[in-house]
Each structure stands twice: as C-alpha cells, then as structure tokens.
C-alpha cells in the first residue's frame, strides 16, 4: 500500500507553526520561528544549551524522572512500574530492554493482551551497547539511559488519542519546563522497528533531540506495509538529555554523575581540565557521527584546532577524564544489570554484563583509581535509591558477584601472556578476528593484548603488528546483543496443522482424575486426537503421561496449537467418530506431579540460599528424577546444597497448599511480577498460576500435587556446571529418594568392608590410604627415574647412523609420560628418537640441527600429529617396519 501522512496537527494550526525545509539536510520541519532556515538538529545546528540552561530550573536525574511522571499522571496517564533491563524475562527475541515500547511487545502491541493501563506513563531504564566505545568520549553517549514515555493504545472499541494530543502534550511539557517554544522544532520523519512502522516527529531544541513521537500503525511485510488494527502512540523522551539541557553542563555525565565524577577525579589525581575544552568537544561531537569518522582522531583534531592546542597534548589532558566519564556511566549500567538479576557468563545477557564490567575494570586500571568497583557501584546505588529502591535491595548479590568476577578477571589477565605468546609464534599479525576470539574465548581485553605485544616487540627481532580499533567493544557487543534466547523445541515430532477445536484438558480441573470418556475427532498416522483428555502432553520440561485408551497402550503424548496428539501402539483399533475410554497410569502421573512440584520448591529454596538473582533456565521432570538449571555466578558448595535440601524438606513438612488458578496476564504480572516466568515465556492473555502458599508463584501448565506434604523427601543427587553462569541440580523425591539413599549406603558399607573399618571411620581411613599412596607414588617415580637413567645408557648404544644423523627406533616398557622423559634425555644434537610401548603408543622427538619434521615423520610410520620437534600417536606395524620407513624417509 502507498503510505501518505499529513504531518499537520491541531497545535501547528492554532499556534501558526510554519512548515519549512532545512537548508542543510533538506528534511521538512515545523517551527514557530519565522526566521529559522535549519531544522535545529545537529549537525545542521550545534548545541547551544551548554553553558546556557534552557529550562527555568535545573533538574537532577531523579527530579526529572518525577517531573515527567507527575506531568503525565496529572493529565490522565496511569503511572506504570518499570520493567527489568533483562527483556528475556517476558520475551524471547531480544536480550536487553532497548526501549519503553519493548515492555509491551509482543503481547500488547500484537493485540493479544490488553495494556495494563491505557493511556499510561512509564520511565523505563534501557540498555544499548551499540555505542559503548563512544561513551565518555563524545559527551552525550550512554550505555544506560531512561526512556520516558506516554503510550496510548487505540482500538476500534477503545480510542484514546492520536497525533493532535500527542504533539500538544509534548509541547505543553516543554513549555512547563520553561523551554522557549520558538526554539522547538518538530522534524517530519519515519520510524521502523520490530516489524512495525509509522510516521514520527523528532522533537528538537538547541541542537539536541529531546523526544521522538511515533505513531505506530503499520506492519511491514517484505517491501510493503499493512495497516494494523491497534494504533499505538509510542513516544520516547530522553530523561538524561532533559536533565543535561536543564543544567547546561559541558557533558551529559556531569549532569548525571557530578558527585561520583568529583570523587573519582580526586581519587585518581586527575588534573583540572578547563570546562571550555570539554564543552567544545561535546559541541563538536554533536556535529559528527563518530562511527562514520572511523575513530576519534578526527574529533580530537577538530577540538585541538578549535582551541589552539597540540592534538597529542589534548589527548593526554582529556583522556583520563573521559575514562572517568565512562566508568561513571558503566557502573550505573552494571547497577541495573546486576540489580535486575543478570548473572555474568560467556553467553547472551551474561556475556554483555561481563563485557561492560571488564571494560570498566580496565579503565579503572588505566586511570589509577584506588576505589574498588564495589565502592563505585555502591555510590550509584545510593544515588538512585530514591527512584529505584529495589536496586539497593540487591546489594548483597551485587557485591558478591563483583568479588567473584574481579577474581576471574585477574586470573584471566595473569594467564593472558602465555596465550598471546603462543599465538605470536604462529603469526606475525594480530588481526581484529584474533582480538575478538581472544576476548570471546579467553576474556582478554584488547588493550591488555596490545600491552603484551608491545612488550614482546621490545625484545623480539620479528615485530608483531596489532591494531585495536576505537570501536572494538561496539563490534563485539553488536555480535552478541542480537543473540536470541534459545528456542526450546516443544515437539519431538513434526506434527501436522489441524483445523480442529482445542482439546479440553481435564487435568486442569482435577489432577486426580484418572479415567475419562472421549470422542475420536481425527486419526493421523499413529496418533489419535480426542475432544477431551486427562493425558498431559509433553511440555514445560515435564514428560508426557502414559496409560491406555480402549485397552491400547499410549506411548507418547504431544501438543500443537492446543490440540493433543495421543500416540498408540495399535492405531487399527480406532475409528474417527467412535467413543473411547481412557485410563491413566496414575502411579506414573503421581511421580511426575511430585517431581514437578519439587522443582518449584527447590527453586524457591535456591533463591533463599543463593539470592534473588537465581533464575530458572531449564528443567526436566521425569518419573524417577528431576533436573533444574539455574543461573548462578559460582559453583554451588556442599554447604549450600545441604542448606537447600534442608529448606526444601522443611517446606515439604510444613504441608503448604499448592493451588492452581487461571489469571489475566496483566493482573498476574501486577500481583506477582515477572518472577512468574521462571519456567519460560508463556504466550496468551490468560495464565495458569501455580502457587505454593507463601513460598513460590509461577506461570505453569504442568501437573502438581495439592499439598507439599505429598512430595515426600527431597534429595539433591548432584550438581554440575553445564555452562558458565548456569548450575544444574539433579534430584529425586519420595521413594525415589529412599532408593538413592539406600544405594549410597550400600556404597559406604561396601567401601568400609573392603577397608575393614566401621563406616564412621571411612573418611579418616581413606585419607590415610591416600597419603600413603602419595608417598608410595613418589618412591615409584624415583625408582622409575633411576630405571630410566639405566635404560638411557643401554639405549645410547642402540643409535644407528644415517648420513649426518643418528636415529634410535626402540620398543620399551612404560607409560607415555615415561617414554617422553626417556626421549627428552636422548634427543640431543643431531639425534632422532622413536619410542613405542605395548599399548600402541609411539612418539618421535628430535634434537637440534635435524631438519626433518617429526610431524611429517609420524604420519609416515603411524597415525598422529604434533609439532616440528615432537609428535605422538598410534602405530600398527612392527618395530622393524617402522625402522625401515624411518630410514627410507631420512635417506631421501
């Protein structure tokens, strides 16, 4: 469809705004200023608010949040609480919250769920890392910013307001703040994102964009647009930019973090920089797109020319202050990331948090700050507690995770030199891909890699080239920021799309029902579809029910689009339209119910012991055991496991009621928060809420016991680290736990019998045997060393001459390590050693002044690989044949 839009609104007509075309960028805009010829936005106009505040009073960040919210609240917009900066809590297509509208996607914007309020106002903290390398340097860029927004959702049945009122509210807010209306321009523009599109206004004053007013009304399909039934007012006001413009500080950082910046400058002994220099830098940066320039040298050069200073001197002067600015921004970003429960890891949102953290630590090292990062983040938490008290409530976790991550960072840096040195032996240039791989795989920041290379180059004849681009972290962040949350395949098999009504799920009404009658609606391959069922279809981590339908075994149950597919052993027994009787294997169902409710109980216990940051990333509920994967920054200790078990079993003994109810999605989120999505994102406007009274609440479609006392004893069988930042617990319940404990007891009794001691003496006896074994191992190693020395002299006599070289081919007794030790002693100048043992192991080692490659040699006489001077592998021929092949190669 052809898109046309009239950008004229009621306000423009009533106040005699004029529509003009910018003399520089040629965009159309609306203004009250009859003399204006440019659109007002940078680079067509430069910042004119620096040193010249544009509002009647100066606003701090906290004050601006309140002012914005109160303004729209007084004008009929219901305030809505912010959502976490982890968008994965309610959607699976993005990791971080990048805009206020992201809070309402996809459910509200797609018309599947009604908005919690309409119209509404929200001040939503957002994180975007695509400009992370510009932060601190341009004066305006932030990784973490707050998008103030008023949203209205217009449908056929409920119309709120559209373009006229949206523009009117924006203009009224700016005038209330004291901004001169003649300085405000409304640039006509177009917005697209997340598959939606619509016309918009960019609202500009004094060279800076303060708001964007989007009218979302189209869906983009290929190169075309289709109208959507829900017309959405999607506005975005830059809260930080409003505060900055109201204060007129040289950069946005002084407006947000002035107290923290002063403390950091004093701590690091940063020399005083003339505010005019920073103001000039920010003003010129506003006229440039740093990424298009390529790096920051062009900006530096322009500032230096403007103020009449040598560019190198300027760089030396302001770089430390720019690091301070970046540290201030990054620590606020980390406060939200960790405060909202992100666990650092090497994947997804955990990777992004670690990237920001390690970049911050590196900057702190560069500028010489003696504060710990914990102290700086505490400053941030204190400064924000008035508007975000929930963040300081996570202080204990934040401090613990910072301790853990700082230790890991130090270990990474300490290992770094060896990793880089090994790489330089193989190549003469460290490329961008090398730097990214070193960062992704080893956690090595590029600056540290460069420092190591610079040191190596001082003493090495061969110089290694390296270039670290100014936008390195931006490149890395963009690669990871768009990672999608993993899609979990619900179906084991590819099931067909059927035009049938959804199957009535009887277990939602009564989980204890085991028999039912139903009508066969459809037969597909080995599956039958009924109008109703008590069989639970596999999903949500829980295994399917088993049983019989009309005496035929049900061996698999799956669901697609609300239709349940029952796989039976003999499909010939069924006909479409027939009535059938189904019977559940209730003992099997009961085991699944116990284990599923136990999953919720253990999850609650984990939060009590480890902290509120714990978040379920996966689960598997089977009849014999359950499995739960959760986020945590360290391995779970034995002490913590005991405490988790203790709390879980206390919950069982308390006999807490377990209730299941259906709730409106908005009501559930308002009452319980996003913690209900522990089991994953749940579609639809109605949620089934499973609540263990006073213990746990989750949106869950599984089958559960009615009281925790029905679970029986819970036993955690083992834990493992399945990936960085994710712990897996395996557990059993009821009789399953009894059997597991009995099996462990048998192991203890058998071990005690072998050692001839009572069970209570096992630890002490095992320790004594271990110490004795270590001593005996030392004695054996000494004897082996002496035998090796004797063997060395015996083998020296067996070397054979081939040209200028000497070669030894011999089969000896010993392990691979023992053969390696012998070869180390024998492979001296001009000698080649080939040793093999009885386990088909073979090694080739050479001394100095031997040109032939051992890697090439081993591939001729056996199978294996290695390096120029040493190769190992397997052999399958006789010693004599190996000798012949080796001699043949050496004679060539």
Curated annotation (Swiss-Prot):
This is Alanine--tRNA ligase. The keyword S-adenosyl-L-methionine does not apply. Its EC number is 6.1.1.7. One of its GO terms (cellular component) is cytoplasm. Signal peptide: none annotated. It comes from Methanococcus vannielii (strain ATCC 35089 / DSM 1224 / JCM 13029 / OCM 148 / SB). Keywords: Aminoacyl-tRNA synthetase, ATP-binding, Cytoplasm, Ligase, Metal-binding, Nucleotide-binding, Protein biosynthesis, RNA-binding, tRNA-binding, Zinc. Coiled coil: none annotated.
């Amino acid at each position: 469809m052809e898109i046309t839009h009239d950008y004229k609104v009621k306000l423009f007509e009533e106040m005699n705004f004029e529509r003009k075309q910018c003399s520089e960028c040629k965009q159309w805009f609306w203004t009250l200023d009859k003399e204006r010829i440019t659109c007002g936005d940078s680079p067509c106009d430069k910042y004119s608010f620096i040193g010249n505040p544009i509002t009647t009073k100066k606003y701090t960040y906290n004050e601006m949040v309140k002012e914005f919210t109160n303004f729209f609240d007084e004008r009929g917009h219901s305030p809505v609480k912010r959502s976490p900066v982890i968008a994965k809590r309610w959607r699976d297509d993005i990791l971080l919250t990048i805009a206020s509208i992201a809070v309402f996607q996809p459910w509200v914007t797609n018309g599947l769920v009604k908005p919690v309020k309409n119209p509404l106002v929200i001040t939503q903290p957002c994180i975007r890392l695509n400009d992370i390398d510009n932060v601190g340097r341009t004066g305006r860029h932030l990784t973490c910013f707050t998008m103030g927004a008023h949203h209205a959702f217009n449908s056929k049945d409920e119309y709120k307001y559209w373009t006229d009122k949206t523009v009117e509210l924006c203009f009224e807010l700016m005038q209330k703040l004291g901004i001169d209306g003649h300085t405000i321009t409304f640039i006509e523009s177009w917005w697209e994102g997340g598959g939606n599109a619509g016309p918009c206004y960019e609202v500009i004053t004094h060279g800076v964009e303060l708001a964007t007013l989007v009218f979302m009304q189209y869906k983009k399909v290929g190169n075309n647009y289709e109208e959507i039934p829900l017309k959405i007012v999607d506005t975005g006001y830059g809260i930080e930019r409003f505060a900055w413009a109201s204060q007129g500080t040289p950069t946005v950082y002084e407006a947000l973090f002035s107290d923290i910046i002063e403390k950091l400058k004093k701590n690091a002994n940063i020399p005083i920089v003339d505010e005019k220099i920073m103001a000039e830098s920010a003003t010129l940066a506003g006229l440039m797109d740093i990424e298009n320039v390529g790096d920051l040298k062009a900006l530096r050069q322009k500032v230096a020319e403007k103020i009449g200073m040598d560019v190198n001197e300027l760089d030396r002067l302001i770089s430390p202050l720019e690091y301070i600015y970046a540290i201030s921004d990054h620590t606020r970003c980390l406060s939200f990331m960790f405060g909202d429960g992100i666990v650092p890891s090497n994947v997804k949102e955990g990777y992004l948090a670690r990237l920001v953290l390690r970049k911050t630590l590196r900057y702190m090292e560069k500028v010489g700050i003696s504060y710990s990062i914990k102290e700086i983040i505490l400053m941030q938490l204190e400064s924000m507690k008035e508007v975000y008290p929930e963040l300081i409530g996570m202080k204990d976790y934040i401090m613990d995770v910072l301790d853990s991550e700082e230790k890991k960072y130090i270990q990474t840096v300490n290992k770094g030199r060896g990793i880089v040195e090994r790489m330089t032996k193989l190549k003469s240039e460290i490329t961008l891909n090398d730097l990214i791989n070193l960062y992704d795989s080893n956690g090595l920041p590029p600056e540290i890699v460069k420092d190591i290379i610079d040191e190596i180059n001082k003493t090495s004849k061969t110089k290694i080239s390296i270039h670290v681009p100014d936008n390195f972290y931006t490149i890395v962040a963009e690669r990871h920021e768009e990672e999608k949350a993993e899609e979990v395949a619900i179906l084991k098999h590819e099931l067909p799309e059927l035009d049938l009504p959804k199957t009535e799920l009887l277990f939602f009404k009564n989980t204890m029902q085991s028999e039912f009658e139903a009508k066969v609606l459809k037969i597909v391959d080995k599956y039958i579809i009924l109008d109703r069922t008590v069989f639970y279809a596999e999903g949500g981590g829980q295994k399917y029910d088993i049983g019989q339908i009309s005496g035929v075994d049900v061996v698999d149950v799956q669901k697609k689009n609300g239709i349940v597919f029952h796989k039976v052993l003999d499909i010939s027994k069924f006909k479409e339209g027939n009535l059938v009787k189904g019977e559940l294997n209730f003992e099997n169902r009961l085991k699944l119910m116990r284990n599923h409710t136990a999953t919720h109980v253990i999850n609650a216990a984990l939060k009590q012991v480890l902290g509120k940051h714990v978040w379920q990333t996966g689960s598997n509920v089977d009849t014999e055991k359950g499995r739960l994967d959760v986020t945590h920054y360290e391995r779970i200790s034995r002490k913590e496991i005991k405490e988790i078990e203790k709390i879980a079993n206390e919950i069982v003994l308390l006999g807490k009621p377990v209730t299941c109810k259906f709730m409106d999605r908005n009501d559930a989120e308002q009452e319980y928060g996003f913690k209900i999505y522990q089991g994953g994102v749940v579609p639809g406007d109605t949620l089934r809420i499973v609540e263990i009274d006073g213990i746990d609440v989750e949106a869950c479609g599984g089958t559960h016991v009615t009281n925790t006392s029905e679970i029986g004893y819970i036993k955690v069988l083992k834990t493992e680290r399945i990936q960085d930042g994710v712990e897996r617990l395996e557990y059993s319940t009821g009789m399953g736990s009894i059997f597991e404990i009995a099996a462990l007891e048998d192991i203890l009794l058998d071990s005690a019998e072998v050692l001839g001691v009572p069970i209570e003496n096992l630890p002490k006896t095992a320790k004594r045997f271990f110490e004795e074994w270590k001593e005996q191992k030392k004695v054996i190693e000494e004897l082996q060393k002496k035998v090796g020395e004797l063997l060395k002299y015996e083998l020296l006599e067996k070397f054979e001459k081939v040209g200028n070289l000497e070669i030894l081919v011999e089969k000896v007794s010993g392990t691979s390590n023992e053969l390696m030790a012998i070869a180390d002693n024998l492979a001296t100048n001009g000698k080649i050693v080939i040793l093999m043992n009885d386990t088909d192991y073979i090694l080739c080692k050479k001394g100095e002044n031997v040109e032939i490659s051992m890697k090439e040699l081993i591939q001729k006489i056996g199978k294996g690989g290695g390096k120029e001077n040493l190769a190992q592998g397997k052999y399958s021929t006789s010693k004599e044949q190996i000798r012949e092949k080796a001699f043949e190669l050496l004679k060539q």
